[in-house]
UniProtKB/Swiss-Prot annotation:
One MF annotation (Gene Ontology) recorded for this entry: dTMP kinase activity
EC number: 2.7.4.9
Name of the molecule in the record: Thymidylate kinase
Catalytic activity as recorded in UniProt: dTMP + ATP = dTDP + ADP
Gene Ontology CC terms, in alphabetical order: cytosol
Keywords attached to this entry: ATP-binding, Kinase, Nucleotide biosynthesis, Nucleotide-binding, Transferase
Length: 203
């Protein structure tokens, strides 16, 4: 924890049903308990405008390019209104999903889409990438069982196991592509507390 300084941007990534939101909240509560200035946010969403865009994105069947541009527009609003001001004020920002989710969920649907996602992001906000990203690595079969046990669902929750495998493989490839930023936490057989303790060791 002594390496963690003010104004850092931390993101959590992975397929649905792996405990990202739980881990984001646990880290947020831990940092608060240490009197460290911190905010917790999410994507797609995080601002009033971006949350409205989220409703369309997760519930409507959009054309692949439309879906990507919707996600990027929501992110721009989120970054400009919330993330960047908080970082400038010295807060640690924890975000449940960010650019890597867009690469895997929207980028995979387009030819050369993953590279396009990072190119668009660099154009919109050239100086803003996460300082550290935690990829919560849970096997797709386990993740989809957890999702099916939830009462709420959206269009991403009800996809097939093949879809989950494709997204999982994408996150694995991104962790190899950006090894300095993305830290893989193998969590299939760990309790939430054990995962949280591993995350702390990387800070």
């Amino acid at each position: 924890m002594n390496k963690l300084t003010q104004g850092k941007f931390i993101t959590f990534e992975g397929v649905d049903g792996i405990g990202k939101s739980t881990q984001s909240k646990m880290l947020y509560e831990y940092l608060k308990s240490q009197k460290i200035p911190v905010i917790l946010t999410r994507e797609v969403g995080g601002t009033t405008v971006a949350e409205k865009m989220r409703e369309i994105l997760v519930n409507e069947e959009l054309l692949p390019m439309s879906e990507l541009l919707q996600a990027m527009a929501a992110r721009y609003d989120h970054m400009a209104r919330k993330i960047i001001p908080a970082l400038k004020d010295g807060y640690i920002v924890i975000c449940d999903r960010f650019i890597d989710s867009t690469a895997c969920y929207q980028g995979l649907e387009l030819e050369n889409g993953i590279d396009l996602v990072y190119s668009l992001h660099k154009t919109l906000m050239p100086s803003l990438m996460p300082d550290i990203t935690f990829f919560i690595d849970v096997e797709p079969h386990t993740a989809i069982k957890r999702v099916n046990a939830r009462n709420m669902s959206n269009k991403f929750d009800i996809r097939s196991i093949d879809f989950y495998k494709k997204i999982y493989t994408c996150f694995k490839e991104l962790s190899n592509r950006f090894p300095e930023r993305i830290k893989t936490i193998k969590a299939s057989h760990l309790s939430p507390l054990e995962v949280h303790e591993l995350i702390q060791k990387h800070l």
